[in-house]
Each structure stands twice: as C-alpha cells, then as structure tokens.
C-alpha cells in the first residue's frame, strides 16, 4: 500500500507519517506536490497545476462529448505518458479524482463556494457548443442521470463530480496501485446518489461491491491507526445501507463500529429541571455515555477538534420559561467522557438509525432530543455539529416555545455555507461519517419552515431561487392559487423544456398529455413520468392503465418504495392477487419495517388461499407496528384459520388493549370449539391445554362487554355449561348463564316474537336445571334456597308473559306452539318449590 493512502482517507497525516514520507522520497515527487495540496485543503491549486493542465490540454473537436473527452484524456495519460512511471501516473490520477470529489463536496455541501471554473483547466474547444457555463452544467447533469431519475438542476460545479466519477468509478480498474480506491469509489457513489430524486439500483450495486472489496483489505485496519479508520468505514457503510432500506445491515455495521470503540450508550432517566420556575427535580430523559475501555486513547490518529468560533453557533432558546438545557440534580453522576471525532460520529449514527427505525411519535422525539443534547454538549466538529443542529430544528419546529429558535437556527445553518472564515479542511473532518445534507436541502428546510409559519411569500422566494418548482407548486396549490402554479410552470417551460417540469404541469392540470410529453423528452427513460401518470390513473380508478404505467416505472428503477406499494394497491383493486403479492413482497424487501405493506401482503396471500404465508407476513407486520388494531384483527382471523389458537388468544388480548369494547363472537366460538373438542393446532399440540388461557380471556372480555348474552353463554361453556364434575365450575357456569339470561330479557322486543320467546324459555329452563344441580352442592341451605328462588321467579315471569301475550282473546286459549313449554315450566316451578321447601326444613 502507498503509505499516504491512510492519511488521505483520514484527511490529515501524523508527524510520524510525514517523517516516513520524507525518507521514502514521497515529498519530492510529482504526486508528492499533489498530496501536499490535497492535505492542505487547497484542491483548486491541483487543477491549476501544470501537470493537470497537460493531462487535459489535448485538442478535441467541438462535437466530442465532454465525458468521452475527459475519460479519453485520463486513460491516455495512464497508458501512454512517458514522462512518469506507471505507479506515479496512477497516484497522480487518483489524487486528482479525490480532489475533484472534495471540491464538489465543498461546492455543494460544506462551502465556502469554490472559485474554480471548467475553463481554468479544460480545452476551450469543449465550450464552443455552449453559450454560457449554465448550458455546460445542464449538459453535464444530464450525463449524471441514472435509472431514469432526475438530478437537482442547480447542482454547483457538476463537472467536478463527472471527473471524480470517471476516475474513481469508470477507470478504477486501471488504478491497481491504489489499494484504498474502493473506499473512495464508495464515497463518490454516496455523493452522487444524494443528487438523484430516487434511489439508484445501479449505484447501490456498485456501493455493495465497494464495501465487499474494502472488507477484504486486511492491512487497512491494522494497529491503532486502522482502528480509527475501521470505525469511520463501518459508519459510512451503515449510512449507505440505511439509505437503501437495508436496516438490518445498517444496524450490524453500527454495532461493529460501537464494539470497536467500546462505547456504551443508554437512554436513561435522571432527576433534573426543565423550566426556570420548577421547584422540584423530576425524572428527565438523557443519554448516558460511557467508555468500557480505552482503545481510542491514541489521539494522533483522530482529527483535532475545530475551534468553537469556526463551528455553527448553537443558538440559545431565549424562552422566559423553558431552560436552554436540562439542569441535572447531580451533574457528576452522568459526567460524559471527552469524546473523540469517531465516538461522536458513532452517537450520531446510533441516533440516525434510531430515527429511521421508530415511528413519528412524541416519545421518539424526546429520545432523539436526548441524543442531540448529548452531541451538542461537546461542540468539536463542523459535520457533527451541523448534523445535530439540523435534526434538532426538525424536532423543535412543532413546539410553539421552540419554533422561533428552530427558524433562527435553520437560517444560521443556511448562512454558514457562504462563510469563508472556516477552512474547508475543518469542515471536511469526519464529513463522510455524518451524512450532512447538501446546502440547498438546508435552504429548502428553511423555506418549508417559513411556509408552515405562514410566511408564504418568503418561502416562495427561497423555493424559486432554488428552482425547486415542485415546492413552488405546492405553495401555490395550498394557497388556492392554482392558476399561478400553472403560469409559473409554463414560464419555465418557455425557457427550457424538461421532463420534470412537464411532470409538474401534469400534476397541476391532471393532464396525461403532459406526462406523455415528459416521457418523450426523456427518450422513454423517465421513471418519474410513468410514476406520475400512474398516480393520475389511480386517482381516476383506472386500475389497468395504472398498473401498466407503474410496471414501466419500476422496470426503469426498481428501488421506488412508494411505487411498489401503490402498484400493489392497484393490483388488489383489480383482484390480481398474484400481482399484488409480488408488488408488496418487493415493498417489504426494500423496507422491512413497512407494517402496512406486510399487512397488504398478507391480504394477498389470504386471497390466494396461502394462509400460512399470510400468518407469517402478519407476524412481520406486527413487529413493525404493534399499535395498528386493523393488523391485529387480520392476525387474529388468520391465526384461527391456520390453527394458531394460542396466538389468537394473545391477539384478542392485544385488541382489548387497543380497543376497549372489542368483541368478535365468531373468533370466540372457534376458540371454544378448539378447546372443548380437543382440536390440534398447527404444531400438533392439543388445544385443551389452552383452557386456562381461554377462561382468562373470557373473564377479560366479559369485564369490558357486559351486555352480550351470547358471549356469557360461551363463557359458561368454557366451564362445562353446568354439566361439569367440578362443583366450582358449575357454580361459575350458573353465574355466566344467569347474566346471559339477564342480557336476553333486557334486549328489545324478544317477548313479542314467539320464536324469540321460545328461545328465552329454553334458556330459562336450562338455567333452572343448572341451579338444581348447583343447589345440591351448596353447604348453606339459605344459599341454595336463594339460588332456586331466583330461577323460579324467572320461570313465573315467563309464564305470566306467555298468558299475557300469547292468549287468544276470543277463545281464551294459549298458543299451541307454547303448550309444551308452558307444561315444562309449570312442572319445573313445582319441582323448584318442593326442593326449596326441603332446604328450608334444614334451617
């Protein structure tokens, strides 16, 4: 390995490395001068160097495409230049590629703006076909489009990314002397991806290959120096996987980084005050950070902290009630160690992963604020400070007491890009481990915040300056100015016709012809055009046409999560369950934590009669969203279908947690039959063993739903319906049947319909027989008499109602349909009276 490679990755050399380079003659070589400029952060000087000028000085024709020309010149220098040996040429081109990437990052992420123009280092013939630099930029941006996804139109100095991509991606196979090249390719890919509207499968495949290659570089992560670099690498991998929905892989990478650092982080409670006038200390959520070891003690391999005056200022809250920070009762108990750059980056990574894997909720926001407070308590590095402040502003914008600071802080974050007092070298420290958004994304966040606060004109000014026409349209649409939205889009189309503008016009007008024009302009490669056209079909319930457009869109770019979900819904509407299953399967592959997609996938499997698959997918859905009662309802039905009776009981309990009065009599009947009949579940176990759990469930159900006679009767059946060998179970069954009878007689109109009346009579007779059986096991004669008297009163009441309601007025005769019931009730009343007398004689 070329000795400076580790320093280039790290961003700075150690003193020992400088001495080693002198001994090896690195400093005096051509690549040594490039290396010196790179490590000083003077990237422009590399492009103005005579060596770079010579590489790109070859004549060309005006018709030659700029990417072809650049690649040809680089390859020619690598293969045919005789002034330097092969290894030296590779080193020079590598350093030029890294400088291109760093300058591009400076131009669009860190600032300050770069004062370098393509004319400074490229042949003037290349610019003859462009009347202005903006025309060149637009052409270069078109070359950077991948998988049919549009790229941000005001990206600054795109020629630098194009050159970095040519060197670090296209001709990487020729740079065999540079072992760390795959890592820089990964960084280039990551930066390129963040310019695209959607995730690119091509870039993800390339990123995965780069990660695999770096993993195989054993000598990259040895000794103390390698330990720091290993943490940085695994953090960068985690962010890549997070972006492409590979949440498990992202967590694995974060865990590796955390294990290497031996850093322990826990959200915990501590006594503290949050307001100025608070008298008592109460529990506050904080992040407790501890070191388990001292593996990162060699500070020469970690970036030196940036002076605070060169960091974005953490603005005060300036509230008359809420304190700027939580005031802890015992500050020393949770004293945080002095953290290095890599340790702070790990905390930021854990925070970002936590945010991605948890729902938007007040508790989640409090937990994230604990992370940001921890990070901001040690302001040391521009990238970490900026990332933490951006997250905090997003969290605070919903608070009336904090929104004013959120706006001021976002403005300060947006303004820092132009600030030239902080060197780019300081801003690039630990940059690739932090996923800082580009500067236009911060300005967009500011405009969105202004719009939410009602400052529509200020928000529009920023959006129009950024040429974010979609946001401009949204502003006008929400303000009810539909005509203005159309007008501004047509004005921009007069300047230049682009697929994105036609798609937006189609969104405003609801006109398919606009999407067709966008599709045509993109040479049939715009995933956005087909996506937007499909969504219009979906709104119009034209499902077949919708499916066709969505299929074309995902064929161009298969990593569109929202499109796969909408495609699945369209297939469901068409009752094409094979298609919907495929779409939702792709959806959950991209985002394993998408509960709704898992739920819809299970619906598809149910319709395809694949109930076991449906059961498993619903289990995944519940892992993602434990609070979604509709998913639990699907789960309980599927559980009973596949014979997972224990899971069905658990699901019923959860539904009672979520919906206080929830009831499903059909499910209760199935569970009862399974337990009583001794049915086997999906695992082959006999369901009789669930009797205790079922009794517990019925107890809970009847405590919530007290007025359903059928549920009370089912509950009685759990205890044998009064026919058990155990007296206590018969007693319990009698109580349930009594409550069921009470529910029956309190319902409307049961006595006016003879069929309903006969049902109630039969239930009263059954209750009386259970009472007789229970009374014989009573230890107290008084209790036995009381029980018998209550059922005798029921029967007498029914006899009275029968004579009152079902006697023919003309003949004075009782209805023949009730003759047998009347006889049975008379007989039983007499028996109950006799039995009561026997018990009274025992007083």
UniProtKB/Swiss-Prot annotation:
Gene3D superfamilies assigned: Tetratricopeptide repeat domain
Family as reported in the entry's similarity comment: Belongs to the TTC27 family.
Parts of the chain that traverse the membrane: none
Source domain of life: Eukaryota
Classification via SUPFAM superfamilies: TPR-like
Record protein name field: Tetratricopeptide repeat protein 27
InterPro entries recorded: TPR-like_helical_dom_sf (IPR011990), TPR_rpt (IPR019734), TTC27/Emw1 (IPR044244)
TPR repeat residues: 453-486, 492-525, 527-560, 561-594, 596-628, 629-662
Sorted UniProt keywords: Repeat, TPR repeat
Gene that encodes the chain: TTC27
